[in-house]
Swiss-Prot record:
Organism, scientific name: Arabidopsis thaliana
Gene name tied to this protein: PCMP-H38
Region described as Type DYW motif: spans on this chain: 552-646
InterPro entries found in the cross-reference section: DYW_dom, E_motif, Pentatricopeptide_rpt, PPR_At4g14850-like_plant, TPR-like_helical_dom_sf
Keywords carried by this UniProt record: Repeat
Name this polypeptide is given: Pentatricopeptide repeat-containing protein At5g48910
Homology family: Belongs to the PPR family. PCMP-H subfamily.
Length: 646
């Protein structure tokens, strides 16, 4: 018999009074069910004995179907039980609404519908547990109008002072982007009441949750300053408070602030947890703070924090982006490798280090392990092909993505292909590829082609592509700078001046070059012609020494990189103070002989700096790693891992 067909029909002659069949005797067994199939067997016993007419029995079955963990949950089954219940009390309504509100967005919409059905039931009134669930559904689905109506109903039924209801109202307004409404509720229910010292721990913890919700809301809107102001006002903070600040700064691109908040957290009495590590590792990766990343890895192991696919992938990404691919491989090999996220992280690590062959090998092993590639895995694989100049392999994998794995290429996949073709000198094919794209190319696609034009010295196509970009993103400096570079390389200074004038008229500024270097856990940041560092005098002396030694080694500055019509000597002086050269000089005076130097650059490393650092690695017998916007450059003994292809 299928229990869902006759959910409440009595059958057989099982005595209702039998201890073996009485609902209360089966409740512990319900809690021990591992699957819905297990539950259906108990459900069948209830039906045969006629006990499903018992409100308590039906509610217990409903509770398991609707609100147990997601692995056991079956909302369709729960909904059938609910619809056929002879009597529904507030608990039953709350249970089914909660179940749907905790599911995906489509099912959360059903929770809202169920709430309105409940309100039309003249025999049932909502209680303090009803509103939080339906408000969660409104927050998840962005149904602000329904949320406001439910807010009014909460007040009507006397729950305006209930901290549980209020916290979910604030969360709903925050998630829907209505920070003004959230702020009014927050200040009325928290800030004004906070004048009195809280002695009730439960209420105090509830208020901390509200503070965290507000901070998260400001971070979601990109208002990091408002979030920080609230955070600083908190008299007590939970680990979630710290995690919210760290993840918020990271998501908004304020990586130094994220790491700084983490350092503050370390000094206090709240220990970082799993979420802390997952939140701060991306910031550490972007800054290249290897020492802090290694500390986190060790902390996780010593604290018994399980390194699962998500945390493991974050560690792989951190080691890869800090230039230590060997440690990334070590982490990867210790993971179960059952999830595509882990494989994708490792493929990306190989890609940014220019190890295209290893990336392809990793991709093939992933297939052999029975893990289906994701669209992200293909982006990383195509990036590896691009950095390795593997045109045929790139074409094959782009085609295989659709024909074998049935994945629809995203704009990022097309961008990888344009980059691959352009870097390989196939500019006409790259342009044709763009024009035949089934989706409209964005500025990133055209920038990839423009970069290839600059690399290949094709000024004619470069002008055409730059004009497209200037129309598409008129206030972006990229097209102006790239075209200026091409004109400067030809000595066409009148056109360079024209570009500079157009930028000035439109108040467009070039992104300043910036290089970071981590010395003993402290980040040092340098910009072009930077003399603000406390050791500026020593750095300048080292730059002079480097210049002298490189000349003796045969170095000649590549002055076509300078976008100014200057005398040759003046151009050399400009190149002398590029941020990556200053960072390299600082690394040489701040570390012992033979120790590796690691630098992170926010832009693409220029040709002259690339040539210089190759020689510096040979003259000073140092391994120097530079991570620019595109990839890693491992300089050693006068050569670079990119083989001068970047």
């Amino acid at each position: 018999m299928n229990p869902t067909q006759t959910l409440f029909s009595p059958g057989g002659n099982s005595p209702a009074s039998s201890p073996a069949s009485h609902p209360s005797s089966l409740f512990p067994q319900i809690n021990n069910c591992r699957t819905i199939r297990d539950l259906s067997q108990i459900h069948a016993v209830f039906i045969k004995s006629g006990q499903m007419r018992d409100t308590l029995a039906a509610a217990e079955i409903l509770r398991f179907c609707a609100t147990s963990d997601l692995h056991h949950r079956d909302l369709d089954y729960a909904h059938k039980i609910f619809n056929q219940m002879p009597q529904r009390n507030c608990f039953s309504w709350n249970t089914i609404i909660r179940g749907f509100s905790e599911s995906d967005e489509d099912k959360a919409l059903i929770a809202i519908t169920l709430f309105y059905e409940m309100m039309s039931d003249e025999f049932v009134e909502p209680n303090r547990f009803t509103f939080p669930s339906v408000l969660k559904a409104c927050a998840k689905t962005g149904k602000i109008q329904e949320g406001k109506q439910i807010h009014g109903l909460a007040l009507k039924y006397g729950f305006g002072g209930d901290e549980f209801v209020m916290s979910n109202l604030v969360r709903m307004y925050v998630m829907c982007g209505f920070m003004k409404d959230a702020r009014v509720l927050f200040y009325k229910n928290i800030i004004e009441k906070d004048m009195v010292v809280m002695t009730d721990r439960r209420k105090r913890d509830g208020e901390i949750v509200l503070w965290n919700v507000m901070i998260d809301g400001y971070m979601r809107l990109g208002d990091c300053k408002a979030a920080r102001m609230l955070f600083d006002k908190m008299r007590q903070r939970s680990v979630v408070s710290w995690n919210t600040m760290i993840s918020g700064y990271s998501l908004n691109g304020f990586f130094k602030d994220a790491v700084e908040v983490f350092r503050e957290m370390k000094k206090g009495d709240i220990r970082p947890n799993y979420v802390t590590l997952v939140s701060v590792l991306p910031a550490i990766s972007r800054l290249g703070s290897l020492e802090l990343g290694e500390w986190l890895h060790l902390y996780a192991e010593d604290s018994g924090i399980r390194i699962d696919d998500v945390l493991g992938s974050a560690l792989i990404d951190m080691y890869s982006k800090c230039g230590i691919i060997e440690k990334a491989i070590h982490v990867f090999e210790r993971l179960p490798r059952e999830n595509v996220i882990t494989w994708s992280a490792m493929i990306n690590g190989f890609a940014i280090h220019g190890q295209a062959g290893d990336a392809i090998d990793c991709f093939c092993k992933m297939r052999q392990a029975g893990v289906r590639p994701s669209d992200v895995a293909y982006i990383n694989l195509l990036t590896a092909c691009s950095h390795g100049g593997l045109v045929e392999e790139g074409r094959r994998y782009f085609s295989q993505m659709v024909s074998v794995d049935g994945l629809e290429p995203r704009i990022e996949h097309y961008g990888c292909m344009v980059d691959l073709l352009g870097r390989s000198g196939l500019l006409d094919e790259a342009e044709e590829f763009i024009l035949n794209m089934p989706i409209k190319p964005d500025d990133v696609i055209w920038k990839a082609l423009l970069g290839a034009c600059r690399m290949q010295g094709n000024v004619e196509m470069g002008k055409r592509v730059a004009n497209i970009l200037m129309d598409m993103v008129p206030h972006d400096s990229g097209a102006y700078v790239a075209l200026s570079n091409m004109y400067a390389s030809q000595g066409n200074w009148s056109e360079v001046s024209e570009m500079r004038l157009r930028m000035k008229e439109k108040d467009i500024r070039k992104d300043p070059g910036c290089s970071l270097i981590d010395i003993d856990g402290v980040l040092h940041e340098f910009v072009v012609e930077d003399d603000s560092h406390p050791k500026a005098k020593e750095i300048n002396s080292m730059l002079v020494e480097i210049s002298d030694k490189l000349r003796l080694a045969g170095y000649r500055p590549i002055t076509t990189q300078v976008l100014l019509n200057l005398e040759e000597e003046d151009k050399e002086n400009v190149l002398h103070y590029h941020s990556e050269k200053i960072a390299t000089a600082f690394g040489l005076i701040s570390t012992s002989p033979g120790k590796p130097i690691r630098i992170v650059k926010n832009l693409r490393i220029c040709e002259d700096c690339h040539s210089s650092i190759k020689l510096i690695s040979k003259v000073y017998k140092r391994k120097i790693t530079v991570r620019d916007r595109k990839r890693f450059h491992h300089f050693q003994d006068g050569s670079c891992s990119c083989m001068d292809y970047w």
